[in-house]
């Protein structure tokens, strides 16, 4: 196994240009493929997840042209993929697997969808159940309620659709993006509390950019009017990834700063932008512009405080919340992260993985179905700890912050290629001994 040794660094300061948002990139790719016309996409995230989506769209007959390293031309299929039979391998990309499952179920074709072993452990039953309510014919090829899947041609009849909201917002997002293809009105009724609501807001905003409207009644009912067609907006610039911003902003809060991220700011449509609220609650100094954010340690404040522990509801920032778990090691007191049940079904069981690795560093950790409670050690963090990353990009990036307190070894550092291939180069560029 490969590893990366990060030496102790005393200071974090500098500027980072963020890669494109993963959530926006894969939504925009899919909507561009479904639209009438050609869409030019700038600042598309270059990563394993977006690569899986691009490969799938090409196999489905979508014309994709790369003009340079930062622009793609996607010629849409006007709502119908020309290829009616395909075997798609989607790795561990939930932002590709879930929406494509929904869209392909309405394509009157025969498709196989599979991924890496971990993808086959991530539940998809709630989405399949919802699609079956409109007539989709989907078969589980191995285990009930989990990928891989086989999708068969079917007659689709939109109706009221009931879907559980407590597992993954990607199920609802996938349904929303797919239903306009049916051409008839449809209503989605959410059962229970919808988690990760900002991601659904993001989906609706991107759909509107392509000319399709969704009516929302609170977070319980979503109406997709009939006779709507996706139209290319012409050009799209993908804003920077707010989840990726969290590591650099946390570094500034822990180790002096200022650290500035460019590409995302006050005007962002991403829910993870609210990570800065947690940092401010911990005492960090935050400045924001329309498309940039800057963080510094509490020492920049007149009261001279250090970072302090927080009790924080993370429902709106499920990915960036992981960064709070490692930041908590540099705060005074016990930090509690709540409403993180979705961590269990991500790239790994993140509650278990995070608890295990934090304990290696000397932290006291208490965990439950939907919370994590972290108390940093009284003594210094255990030096030269070997951190396992579980093939989870966010585990690797979160634990890079440990180098701001002690040397650390990160196993399998290349797992960051899922969303941020050059993360460690950018991280080391803003950290100084």
From Swiss-Prot:
Catalytic residues (positions): 319
One record GO biological process: chorismate biosynthetic process
GO cellular component, one term: cytoplasm
Binding site for phosphoenolpyruvate: 22, 94, 122, 170, 350, 394, 418
Short name of one Pfam family: EPSP_synthase
Pathways per UniProt: Metabolic intermediate biosynthesis; chorismate biosynthesis; chorismate from D-erythrose 4-phosphate and phosphoenolpyruvate: step 6/7
UniProt-annotated location(s): Cytoplasm
Reaction(s) the record says it catalyses: 3-phosphoshikimate + phosphoenolpyruvate = 5-O-(1-carboxyvinyl)-3-phosphoshikimate + phosphate
Keyword tRNA processing set for record: no
EC supergroup of this enzyme: transferase
Keyword Transferase recorded: yes
Classification via CDD domains: EPSP_synthase (cd01556)
Enzyme Commission number, as recorded: 2.5.1.19
Keywords: Amino-acid biosynthesis, Aromatic amino acid biosynthesis, Cytoplasm, Transferase
Binding site for 3-phosphoshikimate: 22-23, 27, 168-170, 196, 319, 346
TM regions (residue ranges): none
Sample GO molecular function, one term: 3-phosphoshikimate 1-carboxyvinyltransferase activity
Domain of life of the source: Bacteria
HAMAP family listed in its UniProt record: EPSP_synth
NCBIfam families recorded: aroA
Family: Belongs to the EPSP synthase family.
Oligomeric form and interacting partners: Monomer.
PANTHER family: AROM/DEHYDROQUINATE SYNTHASE (PTHR21090), PENTAFUNCTIONAL AROM POLYPEPTIDE (PTHR21090:SF5)
Function: Catalyzes the transfer of the enolpyruvyl moiety of phosphoenolpyruvate (PEP) to the 5-hydroxyl of shikimate-3-phosphate (S3P) to produce enolpyruvyl shikimate-3-phosphate and inorganic phosphate.
Name of the protein in its database record: 3-phosphoshikimate 1-carboxyvinyltransferase
Source organism: Nitrosomonas eutropha (strain DSM 101675 / C91 / Nm57)
Chain's gene name: aroA
